């Protein structure tokens, strides 16, 4: 603006004085230069990033015009400076505007936490300082753990920034410079070579045998061959052969191109923006705890209101009744609940860690219990990400199948249908076919890993399975014609190493290209003329293998190109992981639907889907393009029936997950690539692969499978279901005990009767209620039958109707039994004695212990779950029992608790009466079992 103002002022001055002074030549030139510079600045500011779908259609000349760049000399420093003002640096900026202290305070925005804090304040006002400290400590522990989990989960954005390589080779002012990748702007000319990580989205203008590993971006395991020719149609990102994307890796060859998108304007920038905008959803357990907090709040205020009303009717002082009501309400709140929930979740996490599953966020453990949909990426998750040859067809009609997965060399080659295992050249036709694949090859297998292209590695392993792994050493390579995306084949010319002989060509590639170079076909080691009928037969076999989702390679050999002998076809696929098929079956039987969401083509996805039992006769598949074109509401209605989603981008995956969540599903997403990271974050449960997963996917996920074992999800689901039931067991015990204790005190207060329990006895009951017996219910081992149960509904709360009925039933039995003993032992004058309170007190404690025993399971009898299964529970109950006996019989404690000795008959009576709460609970379980058998067998809920 300063230059422009100066220029206009000078023009005005000259205009005023043109009659008196002629314009000097150097001034004219200066004005022209300044005017040109202003135009150049305006022009540079109009240069915009170009979407890959548009850039792929542009010719070299159109690209140069669009970005105002000379393809031979690159941008000038002046142009770069102006463009940076518009486009910024080529990097991702993480927004850390919210301070840490605010994030910590946000953890207190939880109804149960707020209720507990309120209880702590009331405890201080009523001078119950011990209660106040214990409640505050429990809240502090729970809040701190939650904060740490959330703080760690924000690292996924930081990991994504590591995908931008620190340096690159860029052409500027006619010179190739090694510079920081963050300096790139749209229009820069970047040079690429083998091993480079691509620094921005680039439209290629020059290519030499360029292969790019895009597996972290598209999910495709096979490297993509690249070209510099314009494309007629944009298509999806995985088909853009003349565009390379930020963060992907040059596997071989070299190239040069124009930067079309930097930073957040690149495709990885789109992923970054989606991850930044995506919020991790609340888990069902968090929602249940929130609801429980609200229910307990209503219950607490109900007690206060009821007592104040009764006190008002009886004419008692308002303040004293309010104080009693508040104290009882505080006592009713299970302050031990957050700690028990946390301990239960931590123990679940530790158990899962032993099964090689790492959980990063505690509530996620329980969320698995209500997961009813698992959306899984294909490559590296359902499959091993190890290309493997599975089928062979020779030119003379022999068919063979190959066993063994991966690059270990373990497995056999069997002729069909005889299942005869063949080695070496037992079958000449198969031997020659395998030999050609091994010799026309640049891959090396070392320590069960491939060095080179995965497809070539599969051919080397195939040779190893036939004891032909070293046959390549029998030849001396004299020439190589490398593979290119245009010709779709590669060939080598070799000579025998040990003896004089003629050179021979070995070729492999696409069938339609290889057959074009053949004039003969192999028939048991004898070359015969390649007739149209024979060619048609081979073409049909190639189509048949392709329809099974196999990558088909044709092989040939001969003295010269154009006179080769066709040898046959090899079918290669990335096979399913071991145990995946069984896991899918078990999950389906337990009401969990497994869906494949992949960037691969339909044929490949269906082949894997059929192999693992994902696809049935009513299979429905949906492309990423269809997902994008369908409105969210309509998509939510359709996704329930779809088993396979193919050709999907990161944006499509998120849309699919949102649609499933909208339809009421709890969705787990498994993945290993950067392209999965946004979906992993938006899903209710994000599951990343520990070995093959990228750092970005691991940080975005909240669960990691250390060994990449999909079947470990079964154990995780089982654990999640068991944990929720353990939490319900604890809540049932604590609420039934607290309601019974409160009711006894409330009834005695309202009816002007002596209290069955004194202050110290109530304190002892509270210790048992919140102490070891209660805590040990949270560590009950997971029920092995949990996996067979269908996923629980998201709407199911901890305090549901069935649990409330059980709580009220247990509380009623405890109240009735304790009042019976109190009434039986109270003297005729109605005054309470030490024996009266000792009997009532011991009766209540015994009821508590039997109630805890019945709360170990909501559905199974004690003999089914095993009396000695939870040893911590037994030790805690035994400790509580010994403590109670000490309170009764130890003279120092008798003075503190105002108790006296009881006879053996007294203890026998109390034990028999207290066991009624346990017996009644077991009878109720038997009755429910009888009713469930009487009803017709119900199907599991429809898989979502």
UniProtKB/Swiss-Prot annotation:
Q: Which GO terms describe its biological process?
A: mammary gland epithelium development; positive regulation of calcium ion import; protein localization to plasma membrane
**Where is Mg(2+) bound in this sequence?**
672, 676
Which residues are reported to carry the modification Phosphothreonine? 262
* Nucleotide-binding listed as a keyword: yes
CDD domains membership: P-type_ATPase_SPCA (cd02085)
What are the subcellular locations of this protein? Answer: Golgi apparatus, trans-Golgi network membrane; Cell membrane; Basolateral cell membrane
Q: Which residues lie on this side of the membrane: Extracellular?
A: 126-127, 251-291, 351-748, 824-835, 894-903
Q: Give the residues the record marks as binding Ca(2+).
A: 330-331, 333, 335, 766, 770
Task: State the similarity comment.
Answer: Belongs to the cation transport ATPase (P-type) (TC 3.A.3) family. Type IIA subfamily.
Its gene name is Atp2c2
InterPro entries, A to Z: ATPase_P-typ_cation-transptr_C, ATPase_P-typ_cation-transptr_N, ATPase_P-typ_cyto_dom_N, ATPase_P-typ_P_site, ATPase_P-typ_TM_dom_sf, ATPase_P-typ_transduc_dom_A_sf, HAD-like_sf, HAD_sf
User: Where is it expressed, tissue-wise?
Assistant: Expressed in hippocampal neurons (at protein level). Expressed in lactating mammary epithelium (at protein level).
As for what it does, the entry says: ATP-driven pump that supplies the Golgi apparatus with Ca(2+) and Mn(2+) ions, both essential cofactors for processing and trafficking of newly synthesized proteins in the secretory pathway. Within a catalytic cycle, acquires Ca(2+) or Mn(2+) ions on the cytoplasmic side of the membrane and delivers them to the lumenal side. The transfer of ions across the membrane is coupled to ATP hydrolysis and is associated with a transient phosphorylation that shifts the pump conformation from inward-facing to outward-facing state. Induces Ca(2+) influx independently of its ATP-driven pump function.
Q: How does it assemble?
A: Interacts (via N-terminus) with ORAI1 (via N- and C-termini); this interaction regulates Ca(2+) influx at the plasma membrane.
Annotated active site: 377 (4-aspartylphosphate intermediate)
* Chief site of localization: Golgi
Cytoplasmic side, ranges:
1-104, 149-229, 313-329, 770-802, 854-872, 925-944
Catalysed reactions listed for this entry:
Ca(2+)(in) + ATP + H2O = Ca(2+)(out) + ADP + phosphate + H(+); Mn(2+)(in) + ATP + H2O = Mn(2+)(out) + ADP + phosphate + H(+)
- Gene3D superfamilies referenced in this protein's UniProt entry, alphabetically: Calcium-transporting ATPase, cytoplasmic domain N, Calcium-transporting ATPase, cytoplasmic transduction domain A, Calcium-transporting ATPase, transmembrane domain, HAD superfamily/HAD-like
The GO molecular function terms of this record are: ATP binding; ATP hydrolysis activity; metal ion binding; P-type calcium transporter activity; P-type manganese transporter activity
Keywords associated with the record:
ATP-binding, Calcium, Calcium transport, Cell membrane, Golgi apparatus, Ion transport, Magnesium, Membrane, Metal-binding, Nucleotide-binding, Phosphoprotein, Translocase, Transmembrane, Transmembrane helix, Transport
Residue ranges of region Interaction with ORAI1?
69-93
EC supergroup of this enzyme: translocase
Which residues get modified to Phosphoserine? 266
Against Pfam families, the record matches this protein to: Cation_ATPase, Cation_ATPase_C, Cation_ATPase_N, E1-E2_ATPase, Hydrolase
Give the protein's recorded name. Answer: Calcium-transporting ATPase type 2C member 2
